[in-house]
Amino acid sequence: LFDYPENWTITKEEVSQTDETVVLTNERGSTITYTYIGGVAEGQLGSGSATDMTRIELSAVADSQFIPGYVDARNYEDLGKFVVAETKITGTMDMLTDSDFVDTDGAVSFAVLPENRTGTEETTDLPLRVQNTFWYSGYVSFTAQAPDGQFTEAEQTEVIAILSSFRVEDN
């Protein structure tokens, strides 16, 4: 579950036996995407590049209401505290021609992630929606992207509020 203001609308909602995707969009075209990917074994979500790496800085900007618990008789409390993280691309490397990362002032996005994922990640997993997943009886991502890679101040405030409201439904 998550809350969102009236100026964000659901522009896509797809549910299958194993997957779910919900996309919120505002008038400028910024998006917030919730994705659940089931039917894929843990550790088997492939989407990486064989030649390109990306360096990403993940910084906690707010606490998340998401508190992991039991799903299908498995306890996920070991995932720990969740946060809303600002994710910024800070470097790229072509592994065929570069020997180190080339510094980049890249796109900013936001994601709900375990707090222990903050810091610097070097990855071949892109797009960021795939890279910013966590395992919770399936792959979960809750991310926000701006069409030009940068959010307005008002959008950033709304995005952080929406992402931080993500939580498990109480039964």
PLM region spans:
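Secretory pathway targeting signatures of secreted, lumenal, and periplasmic proteins
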Residues: L1-F82, K88-T90, D94
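Short, well-structured beta-strand
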Residues: D78-N171
